[in-house]
Swiss-Prot record:
It comes from Drosophila melanogaster (Fruit fly). This is DNA polymerase epsilon subunit 2. The keyword Transport does not apply. InterPro entries: DNA_pol_a/d/e_bsu (IPR007185), DNA_pol_e_bsu_N (IPR024639), POLE2 (IPR016266). Gene3D superfamilies: 1.10.8.60, 3.60.21.50.
Length: 525
C-alpha cells in the first residue's frame, strides 16, 4: 500500500506547491488514501477541484491542515445539496426532537424545554397524555370519525356510517348510551377488571363476547372500544386500534419542521437533490444483523467472511445489533471482543473507507439499564474498534437512520415475545402473526405499546420511540423468526437472530425499497 501511495503523495505535494500551498506528509498520506481508488485522470480532476476549494476557504497560512482537507472533500461530495443536507446520518435517540400537539391551531409545535433522565414526576402522566393527543387528532381526521358533509345533494344519513368519538366523562355523565366508541388506554386498575382510560376519566370494560380486531391487545396500548354503555360498564362489541395514517397526511400538520432529527433545520424528505441521489445510487445497500455474539468463534469467522465479501462492493452501512456477549457484567470481556471485531477487517481497506459500521446494543449488553432509549456502548470499551475502523458509530437503542430522503428506525428488542405474553387475546390466525405484529406498532405509532412494567421507558424521551409520522422502514432486531410486512407505506422488517438462523441477515436496497434475504454459507472444504 505504501509503495502505491508514494508516487501519489509526490504528485499531491507538487500540485499543492504550484497552487501556493504546503502540505505535511501525514496530510498528503491522508489525501492519497482518499484518491487511491480512482484512476490517474480522475485523481487529477479531484486534485484540481480540491485545490480550488482550498483557495475559496481563504486559509490564514499556506499550510494545509487535515481539517481543511476534510472540509473540502465533504463539500465536494455534497455538490448539488443544500446546507445541512446529508446523504447518510445516524441520529441519536436522545437528540430526537419532541413535538406537542396544539389543539387551538391543530398543528404540532416543537417543544424546546430541556429534557433529562431523572425528570419531574409530572412527566409520568404527561408522556402518556402526549401519546394520547397524537392518536386522538389522527383518529378524529379518519373517514369513520370525521364530521359528515353533504355531497352532490346526498345527505349525511345516506353516506357511509359515521361514528362519534366519546370521552370517558361523556359516558360517566349518563346512565346508558348505545353504540358508544371510546379512545383510551387499556389498563387494569383492579385485578381482573380492565378499563379504558383517557384524560377525562376511566370506564370499566366488559370484554365477554367482544370481537377483537387484528393485532396484539396488551395492557398499556391505546384502543378503540365500541359497545353499549350501561350503569358504569361498557359492554364491548368490538375492540380495535386507532386507525393508521399515511406519512404524507401526517406531515401536513408539522409544516416544514424537521421531525426526524439530525442537523438539517428542515425535513430532508422533500429534498430534490437527495431524491435524485437516491434514484441514481442503485448499488447502495444497508446490511442488518441482529444477535451478533462476538464471544462465539463461529460468529467471528462468519463476520470475517462477511467483511471480506463486501470489501469489493462496500455497502453504505453495516448495522450490528447485540447482545454482543453472553456476560452482562464483564466490561473487559466486551472490550476484548470489540477489539477482535476491528481486527477482522484488517485487510478490507475499501470497506473501512466507504462503510459505516453501526453498533446497536441490546438490553443484555453492559453499562446501561434495561430502559428505552438505551445509551450506546461507551467509547472507552470500543477504543480499539474505533481506531481500527474509524467509521464505526456507537448507536443508541433505538436509533434512527437517514439515507437521502428515506427514514429508517432500528430497534433491538425481543418484542414479539412480550406481545405474546401480555396480550389479552391471542390472534386466532397464527400463520399471519407477523401481520398482527406490524399492525400493532404501526397503528399505535409507537415502538413499545405495552405496560411500562413489561418495558420501561424514559418519560422525557418517549418521543424517540414514536412512529409518527410513519417512517419508510422499521427494522426490529427480534430473535424470533425473520419476516417483513408492509402497512400504509411503511415496511416492518424483523432481521431474526444471526446465531439461530444459520447466519442469515437482511440487505436493504434503498433505490428500489426492496429487502433481500442473505446467508453466509459454510465454506467448501
Amino acid at each position: 500500500m505504501d509503495v502505491d501511495l508514494l508516487p501519489l503523495r509526490k504528485r499531491i505535494t507538487n500540485t499543492f506547491k504550484l497552487c501556493g500551498f504546503l502540505i505535511r506528509s501525514e496530510n498528503s498520506s491522508y489525501l492519497a488514501e482518499q484518491l487511491l481508488p480512482f484512476d490517474a485522470a480522475e485523481r487529477d480532476k479531484w486534485l484540481t477541484v480540491i485545490t480550488e476549494n482550498l483557495q475559496s476557504q481563504k486559509l490564514l497560512t499556506p499550510h494545509v491542515e487535515r481539517a481543511a482537507l476534510e472540509k473540502a472533500i465533504n463539500e465536494l461530495n455534497r455538490v448539488g445539496l443544500d446546507e445541512g443536507e446529508t446523504v447518510f446520518a445516524l441520529i441519536d435517540a436522545f437528540t430526537v426532537p419532541r413535538f406537542r400537539y396544539n389543539q387551538r391551531i391543530k398543528k404540532f409545535e416543537l417543544d424546546t424545554q430541556p429534557r433529562q433522565l431523572l425528570t419531574a414526576p409530572r412527566m409520568k402522566s404527561d408522556y402518556m397524555q402526549q401519546r394520547y393527543a397524537m392518536l386522538l387528532q389522527k383518529t378524529l381526521r379518519h373517514d369513520l370519525f370525521a364530521p359528515a358533509v353533504i355531497q352532490d345533494g346526498v345527505g349525511a344519513e345516506a353516506q357511509a356510517k359515521k361514528f362519534k368519538l366519546q370521552f370517558a366523562e361523556n359516558l360517566l355523565a349518563t346512565s346508558a348510551m348505545k353504540e358508544a366508541v371510546v379512545l383510551g388506554l387499556l389498563t387494569q386498575l383492579k385485578e381482573g377488571k380492565f378499563y379504558v382510560e383517557d384524560p377525562t376519566g376511566c370506564v370499566q370494560l366488559d370484554l365477554t363476547g367482544a370481537r377483537f380486531h387484528a393485532g396484539f391487545f396488551c395492557e398499556g396500548c391505546f384502543v378503540l372500544a365500541e359497545g353499549n354503555y350501561n350503569n358504569g360498564v361498557l359492554k364491548v362489541d368490538g375492540l380495535g386500534f386507532p386507525p393508521a395514517e399515511p406519512a404524507n397526511s401526517s406531515r401536513a400538520f408539522f409544516g416544514t419542521a424537521n421531525t426526524w432529527g439530525g442537523e438539517s433545520a428542515k425535513l430532508l424528505k422533500y429534498s430534490a437533490g437527495l431524491q435524485e441521489l437516491e434514484r441514481t445510487n442503485t448499488e447502495t445497500t444497508i446490511v442488518f444483523l441482529s444477535d451478533v455474539r462476538l464471544d462465539l468463534p463461529v460468529v467471528m469467522e462468519k463476520l470475517r467472511q462477511l467483511f471480506v465479501g463486501y470489501d469489493s462492493c462496500p455497502p453504505q452501512a453495516i448495522v450490528l445489533m447485540g447482545p454482543f456477549t453472553a456476560s452482562t457484567r464483564n466490561h473487559h470481556e466486551l472490550r476484548h471482543h470489540l477489539d477482535a471485531l476491528g481486527g477482522l477487517a484488517a485487510g478490507c481497506e475499501q470497506l473501512k473507507k466507504q462503510t459505516d459500521l453501526i453498533l446497536v446494543p441490546s438490553s443484555e449488553d453492559p453499562t446501561a439499564p434495561n430502559i428505552l432509549p438505551r445509551a450506546p456502548i461507551p467509547e472507552c470499551l470500543a477504543a480499539g474498534l474505533l481506531k481500527a475502523w474509524p467509521r464505526t458509530q456507537l448507536a443508541t437503542n433505538p436509533c434512527r437512520l437517514q439515507y437521502c430522503t428515506q427514514q429508517i428506525v432500528v430497534c433491538r428488542l425481543d418484542l414479539m415475545a412480550k406481545f405474546c405474553r401480555n396480550t389479552l387475546h391471542f390472534p386466532e390466525d397464527t400463520s399471519q402473526i407477523e401481520q398482527h405484529f406490524a399492525r400493532t406498532i404501526v397503528c399505535q405509532g409507537h415502538l413499545v405499546p405495552i405496560h411500562p412494567i413489561a418495558m420501561p421507558v424514559h418519560w422525557d424521551y418517549d418521543p424517540a420511540l414514536w412512529l409518527y409520522p410513519l417512517p419508510d422502514l422499521i427494522v426490529m432486531g427480534d430473535s424470533c423468526q425473520s419476516f417483513s410486512s408492509s402497512q400504509h407505506g411503511c415496511t416492518v422488517l424483523n432481521t431474526g437472530s444471526f446465531v439461530k438462523s444459520k447466519f442469515a441477515f437482511k440487505v436493504y436496497i434503498p433505490a428500489t425499497r426492496t429487502i433481500e434475504d442473505s446467508e453466509i454459507p459454510d465454506e467448501l472444504e
